[in-house]
Amino acid sequence: MRRITFLLFAAAGYVLGVWTASPRPRAETGASAIARASEAPPLDGSRGVHLAMNLASKEKPKPDAHDGKLRVICFGAHPDDCEIKAGGVAARWAAAGHHVKFVSLTNGDIGHWRDAGGPLARRRNAEVRHAADLLGITTEVLDNHDGELLPTLENRRTVTRLIREWRADIVMGPRTNDYHPDHRYTGILVQDAAYMVAVPFFCPDTPPLAQNPVFLYYSDHFQKPYPFQADVVVGVDPVIEQKLDALVGMESQFVEGGVSGSPELIAGGEPKLEERRKIVRESFRKRDRGIADKYREQLAAWYGKEPAGKIEYAEAFEICEYGRQPTKDELRKLFPFFAAR
């Protein structure tokens, strides 16, 4: 019996020695890891895209936080929300040398009539990266499932850290009254961070902001419990084609229709797709033209009556009461576009 036990221990020791002596494969980094992650099937829904998304978001070096330029971070629930609501003003800031980051709190992995999971999440991540290149900004997609975002403590910490790490002067997000639960909870998470970004011992691993940012809501059409108030309206005529290019490039959502699409929508190959691209472009053009027309009086307050009358496209924002409350002079510094169309 002792001899058998001894032999078993000896065999185990030999196997352990061989295992420890064998070289371990080196972890892949950079582009090779992104390629590997995009090829491998996800193990759990969209979780397989986590590595690819994190690496993709870190490809660009962070801009200098002390270069005297404005720093803006915009939050959306899905990979397209920020681009729709603030793509124009983001492009204007970026063209003036300021730093803008878009963050999607979910990976959009159920936002299509045909595709889902990791393949769709990877596709949508690629779409926002392309849009970011067109707009001149930085983008990041977090690995939360589409349709499952909740205002948890961990998500509050994540949003707080992102705002602090960006050293934001301006933070944007949706209002909390919205048809989509992910939109509502994105609004809540951004609101919940509005005070916490300055609290030293909340997320002490990231330095608190010395000055609370100005928090702004995107425009919407919801009326209850109260309608959107257009405190700041920015003309986006100089960058409207950039914005439209970015949105048309999100083909999974707009050309193919996202969750509301169907095979019939894109049947007919490239000619049909090109027709759809034109329809999408004109639809978003009409949207931003409608904002300019609706808030013409507010445009006049910022630009003057005559210049405001010439503005064809606009984006509008409401000041959140939870962040810093800027004066009109401060807003002119934060939105340095009002001296020109």
Whereabouts are the PLM-identified features?
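C-terminal accessory domains and tails appended to enzymatic cores
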Residues: 34, 40-59, 64-68, 201-204, ...
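Divalent metal-coordination and catalytic microenvironments
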Residues: 80-82, 106, 128, 139, ...
